[in-house]
Amino acid sequence: MNFIKDPIDRFIKLETSSSIVLFSASIAALILANSGLSEAFLGFWKNYITISLPGFELSKPVLKWINDGLMAIFFFVIGLEIKREVLIGELSDLKKASLPIVAAIGGMVFPAVLFVTLNQGKPGMEGWGIPMATDIAFSLGILTLLGKRVPVGLKIFLMAFAIIDDLGAVLVIAFFYSSKLIWTNILIGLAIVALLSILSRFKLYSKYFFFIAGIVVWVLFLKSGIHATIAGVLLALTIPIQRHIKTTTFYDKGQEILDGFLEECKKESKDKTILNHKQLDAIDEMEELTEKTASPLQFLEHRLHGWVAFIILPLFAFANAGVVFSFSGDTNTVLASNIGLSLIIGKFVGIFVISFLAIKFKISELPKNVNFMSLAGVSFLGGLGFTMSLFINNLAFTDEVLIDSAKIGILLGSFVAGLLGYLLLRFSATKKNPSAN
């Protein structure tokens, strides 16, 4: 089972480590926003950066370059994860996927319904999509704090429903948080995506061509009214999952290259600092062979995951989490409370109750060594909306008061949900769960 377990372990370790960086960036943003440097810190993100080419100009504030540009890479990685999970991962088997699917649906619908119910007739109704999100990095980070007490099945369940939750968030952004649509740009962008899919289908994949085409699609979507990050998801779905060469071919060819390299080394009387041309050619061949052994999808996911986890998401949190904690007349405490409650209660009820019913009616089954109390704990962790909630917040509102009020609700709601989830899991877990080994 190592071929399944090892990638999952690597994913969890990466998400756990990144959650620490993400948390640190968020705390730093909150400290700066509530210090004497507040005006300079918050004002910095409003400075404009312009890219100007003959016949083309793109000018946006720093905050928009992060939220529309860098976050498109984040959504590209989400798209890669979704495609992998659906084709060969936990979501490829309907029986195994049924519980994460119903949990994710409940975890999206109930918070939105609760928010609309609580906020009926009050300012900020556009924010109904904010409590639907789950931050996979933070939720997995808290789960990993419990170490071997947590069964692997519970971690896989959390990963799976969080990925489906991300897919739901993408659809919500595409259909409900897009502005006036320019159909010419949309259709051209979709035509390019379709072309890339056809090229991928016929094994005509070129990372350089796909990269250039991806930038064109991003610009088209940016100027179309659909949020530019959707381009990242669509482009990810065109990346091939098939490998160019078999692992046995890699071994045989690799051995041949290494043997040639070794022969060149033996010709030298001593280990020289400078390699000869044949040795350099061998290194180039080995690098090309190594890249072809992993599928383009797996290669890109592996290469980009670290950048997203340790650079893009922390930078996003640093730019967006800064909010002045002032419960004065300027803060919409009702909106903040409603978002917070929807994340804590709505997520818990949606994930746990729907999962419980699915299990009782034999639609799904609990993962191995998982009990209902630990399922309840993970249901609370689903209320850690954080990065995705902050992202939707910026799309839902234009009023600074509503944006900041929602941020307070997101931060407090995520904190309480995370704490409740940790405590429930801490009490439900045994001192050492053998299934975690």
Give the role of each language-model region.
Residues L32-F44, K60-L63, V77-S92, F110-G129:
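Transmembrane alpha-helix boundary signature
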Residues I4, R10-L14, S206-A213, A228-K368, ...:
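Predominantly late transmembrane helices and immediately cytosolic-facing juxtamembrane segments
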Residues K5-D9, V77-S92, L140-P151, A194-L204, ...:
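C-terminal ends of transmembrane helices
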Residues E85-A112, I182-A191, F327-F348, I410-S414:
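Entry/N-cap segments of selected transmembrane alpha helices
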Residues G55, S59-I88, W307-F327, I345-F352, ...:
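Hydrophobic transmembrane alpha-helices of secondary-active transporters
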